Regions:
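Acidic/His-enriched low-complexity segments
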Residues: 1-151
Length: 151
C-alpha cells in the first residue's frame, strides 16, 4: 500500500469528493529535448482548449524546472505580470483566448534529481519515470490521469 508520507510522494492523495474537472483540454503535446552534460533543455508545446469559458488562469504542475521563456501563440509572457512560478506549479494569469498554443522553454538537471521521478541520472544513464506524477519534474503540465493527449 502506498504511503502518503513517502519522501518520493509529490502531492497528497485526492479524494473523490475533492476532485475538480480540469478547465482545459490538452489534445496535443510536443516535446523537444536537448541533452547537455549538466542539464537538459526541454521545450514543451501544449495545445490548450478551454472547457470553462469563465476560466482566466491556468495552473500547471511542475517541480525543479528553470523557466527560460514562455509564449502564448508566439507572444512572449513576462514573469510576475503574466505568470508566476511557485515551488510545485506554474500559474499563467488572465488568459483571454479559448484556444491557444502554450510554449514553455525550460531547463532541468537530471544529475541533481534524486527523487527517482521525472528525468534523472542513474549510473551514468539518463532515465525517466513519469508514473505517478513524475512528468511534472520534466515539464510543466496538468499531471493528472484524466488528461489524455496525443504526443
Amino acid at each position: 500500500m502506498d504511503n502518503p508520507k513517502n519522501q518520493n510522494s509529490i502531492s497528497r492523495y485526492v479524494k473523490l469528493e475533492d476532485y475538480k474537472v480540469f478547465d482545459y483540454e490538452i489534445p496535443e503535446i510536443f516535446l523537444d529535448f536537448v541533452i547537455k552534460k549538466n542539464f537538459v533543455n526541454v521545450t514543451t508545446k501544449l495545445k490548450l482548449v478551454k472547457k470553462n469559458k469563465n476560466t482566466r488562469n491556468l495552473i500547471l504542475d511542475g517541480t525543479d524546472i528553470l523557466i527560460k521563456k514562455i509564449f502564448i501563440d508566439d507572444s512572449l509572457l513576462e514573469e510576475e505580470e503574466d505568470y508566476k512560478q511557485q515551488k510545485n506549479n506554474l500559474k499563467i494569469k488572465n488568459i483571454k483566448k479559448d484556444n491557444f498554443l502554450l510554449k514553455i522553454e525550460g531547463r532541468i538537471k537530471p544529475k541533481e534529481n534524486t527523487s527517482l521521478l521525472g528525468m534523472y541520472e542513474s549510473n551514468g544513464m539518463i532515465t525517466t519515470q513519469c508514473e505517478a506524477e513524475g512528468f511534472r519534474r520534466i515539464s510543466f503540465h496538468a499531471d493528472r490521469p484524466d488528461i489524455l493527449s496525443k504526443y
